[in-house]
A protein has these predicted regions:
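Active-site anion/phosphate-binding pocket segments in diverse small-molecule metabolic enzymes
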Residues: 3, 8-41, 45, 49-51, ...
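Active-site-proximal beta-alpha core segment in soluble small-molecule metabolic enzymes
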Residues: 25-27, 31-42, 52-214, 218-222, ...
Length: 388
């Protein structure tokens, strides 16, 4: 006897997971990031006014510190920003699609061999960090018959990127590669700007001045990052590169002047009561000393909450700390809700993981890192919501 096979008709994807509808992805994920574009713009204006008459450029590398360059860069442009810094060429290519043509896009890591034409096609301005990068960019300029815009970076003490100071004469030799390069900016980067009294700041500025003595007149100069802006006007030169301060992060005294930009919440998946002696999480790293009420939150180390926070971190609800219990997993973490009224939290509710009660600086201290990393490592599964 044959059995009639029923044809399988899957439901439309939209009916199951309406992720393409604005604001709906958060209904189906474990957590959400709320980014205030208005606060980003306000922070830009604060720093712009602070450093005037120097220009204020925005550092939006690493997807605007993980918060979404596609939304943040246009908001900064609308606030008056016209110069943007990224780390890699592909980031500049992506921004070129969404920013007007008068936005200058600087690529801090310079150019990989063979990437010169792609940079030219994207209208990017490479930050040239070596003789080889200068020579490669100049070869393309000679091939197209005109000098090509670039920035030139010198290493004054960071030991990371840039030509050594002794190459200043080479870099600006009118018979050398500079003949086919249009220098838009000469820059260096401060290593200890977040320690205002450190003697290294003055040493780097003095080294920068010696380099500038070789430079042609009229080329813009840049030394300060967010923290460097608070070292005094001698460090501002013509342009400051502002990153952390835009996002409300601790960059020396600027943190007190900046508006908070980001909040992260996690969704309660389940609550439970456990008896004394119950193990919690992988390895039973925690055993309940007495009866406890626990809530499982749909955020884990894949979303930016690393395992090293397991024993020290926590969430917040209505201003009250909810300590983490047991080891943080890839997709979830557990908090102690024993101090809350029994019905205070239920499945679907949100707890604060990052915000006014759990600041980036607190998470950085607990995780033995810096607040920049706390923001930059936020996972792509967290739904990003933007408010103006």
């Amino acid at each position: 006897m044959s059995r009639r096979r029923e044809s399988f008709r899957p439901l439309p994807a939209l009916a199951l997971f309406p992720t393409d509808q604005p604001g709906r992805r958060s209904d189906h994920g474990g957590g959400r990031i709320r980014v205030s574009l208005g606060a980003v713009a306000a922070n830009y204006r604060t720093m712009r006014d602070r450093i005037a008459p120097a220009a204020c450029a925005a550092v939006v590398k690493a997807d605007a510190y993980g918060l979404g360059a596609a939304r943040i860069a246009p908001a900064l442009y609308d606030a008056g920003c016209r110069a943007f810094f990224v780390a890699h060429l592909f980031e500049a290519v992506d921004l070129r699609r969404i920013l007007p043509a008068d936005a200058e896009l600087f690529v801090l890591n310079g150019l990989a061999p063979g990437a010169e034409y792609a940079a030219l096609a994207a209208g990017a301005i490479p930050v040239l960090n070596s003789r080889e990068q200068m020579e490669g960019w100049a070869r393309l300029g000679r091939a197209v018959g005109r000098p090509l815009a670039a920035a030139i970076q010198f290493d004054t003490g960071m030991s990371r990127l840039g030509l050594p100071p002794e190459d200043a004469a080479f870099a600006f030799d009118p018979e050398g590669p500079i003949r086919w390069i249009e220098p838009r900016l000469i820059l260096s980067h401060l290593a200890v700007a977040d320690t205002p009294g450190h003697a290294g700041n003055a040493r780097q500025r003095q080294a920068f001045e010696r380099i500038l003595a070789h430079a042609p007149p009229g080329v813009a100069r840049s030394l300060a990052n967010s923290a460097g802006c608070w070292l005094g006007q001698d460090y501002h030169y013509d342009l400051c590169r502002i990153g952390a301060a835009l996002f409300g992060l601790d960059a020396s005294p600027s943190a007190k002047a900046m508006q908070p930009v980001v909040e992260v919440t996690g969704r309660v998946i389940q609550t439970r009561a456990v008896p004394a002696g119950a193990g919690v999480g992988y390895g039973w790293a925690v055993t309940a000393a007495e009866g406890m009420r626990l809530a499982t939150i749909g955020v884990g180390y894949a979303d930016g909450w690393p395992r090293q926070l397991s024993a020290v971190g926590g969430a917040a609800f209505e201003g009250r700390l909810l300590p983490f219990v047991g080891r943080i997993s890839m997709d979830s973490l557990v908090v102690d809700v024993s101090a809350l009224p029994p019905d205070a939290l239920k499945a679907g509710d949100q707890v604060e993981l990052l915000g006014p009660n759990r600041t980036p600086e607190q998470l950085a201290l607990e995780g033995a890192t810096i607040d920049y990393e706390v923001i930059a490592r936020l996972g792509r599964r967290l739904c990003r919501e933007y408010v103006s």
